[in-house]
Amino acid sequence: MKILVLNCGSSSIKYQLLDMETESVLAIGKVERVGMEDAIFEYKGAGEKIKEIGTILDHTAGVRKVLKALTDPVHGVIQAPEEIAAVGHRVVHGGEAFVKSVIITDEVKRTLRELFDLAPLHNPANLTGILAAEAALPHAPGVAVFDTAFHATMPRKAFLYALPYAMYKGHKVRRYGFHGTSHKYVSQRAADLLGRPLEEVNLITCHLGNGSSVTAVQGGKSVDTSMGFTPLAGLIMGTRAGDLDPGVIPYIMAREEIGISEVNSMLNKHSGILGISGISSDMRQIEEEMEKGDPRAVETFEMMEYRLRKYIGAYAAVLGRVDGIVFTGGIGENSPLFRKAVCQNLGFLGVTFDEEANNCRGQERIISGPDSKVAVMVIPTNEELMIARETAELIRNR
């Protein structure tokens, strides 16, 4: 069974074609600047990587270009589009309507439109991708896999905010959490690495990248997570503030004489690593400037480590027993320095640290010492494979 995985943004398409018999990637690529005359198309299948620049009018044209590349006599990996059994779509927000992956129907699409207000930057683009795939691949059923679904198992005491209850009842204002597909994938891999059934394992999974979140996973189920109603809450991120006193917002608006859109832009695009450091939103550059002794880079790094450590401590209290801590995402997988800084301060959990094992980037391994009471792991995430698995399972069992 071959599954095409699509992750559509407002002007982009990221895609992979996977063979689920071997769970191998047959082709991978992306389309950027959709709707522009200088759209960028990238494809890597059989042979060398292809990059083209030209007009791609819309997402449907983009998907059709992907299919043309996949079936190309020289660079293609399939002979006909009909070999694609189904299309798995990343959808950012499922709200309370979707607590697991679903086969896409007209009713599902109607409900997705009703959820636009919960994720105005992402869900409309995700639906555009769904419609584009239906137009280009009418034979292939679609499956929606939601970033929020893994966190649907959180108890009410964890997801409700202490606001007037009418805000929840009337507007569904609550903690939803994100990065669920990544947290689900690495928690399953962590149980495999530990050689234990997932149902018996308590984990703290740390997805650290430009967007970052941490999740308490009890027996394979999310019981708490750092992101909230939006992906703005929790850890310090590339350009997002993470947790902050809500009272700061009206104060800044009054002092700076700015409106909702300006403060929203500040919190989402100009805060976090970039805002504190004044250098970059990229952790690699922060670490480079740290080595040169830049005080703001040092302070940014220390704040990030401190915030994550606070969450790990809190989630250890939530879980009662921690069997494993997982680092994933761009920073989690590729920054030995940050992992070391965090782990050196986790002695209260019985964590010991293997510096030699930690000296790796993008490799799956255990980096805690042999006498550590908690296994600390680096597990490269694979959201596309997780989406493909969920898609294949639904298609097989429908």
Curated annotation (Swiss-Prot):
Pfam families: Acetate_kinase. Substrate binds at R90. It comes from Symbiobacterium thermophilum (strain DSM 24528 / JCM 14929 / IAM 14863 / T). The active site is at D147 (proton donor/acceptor). GO terms for molecular function: acetate kinase activity; ATP binding; magnesium ion binding. Catalyzes the formation of acetyl phosphate from acetate and ATP. Can also catalyze the reverse reaction. Pathway: Metabolic intermediate biosynthesis; acetyl-CoA biosynthesis; acetyl-CoA from acetate: step 1/2. ATP binds at K14, H207, L208, G209, N210, G211, D282, M283, R284, G330, I331, G332, E333, N334. The gene is ackA. One of its GO terms (biological process) is acetyl-CoA biosynthetic process. It catalyses: acetate + ATP = acetyl phosphate + ADP. HAMAP family: Acetate_kinase. Keywords: ATP-binding, Cytoplasm, Kinase, Magnesium, Metal-binding, Nucleotide-binding, Transferase. This is Acetate kinase. Belongs to the acetokinase family.
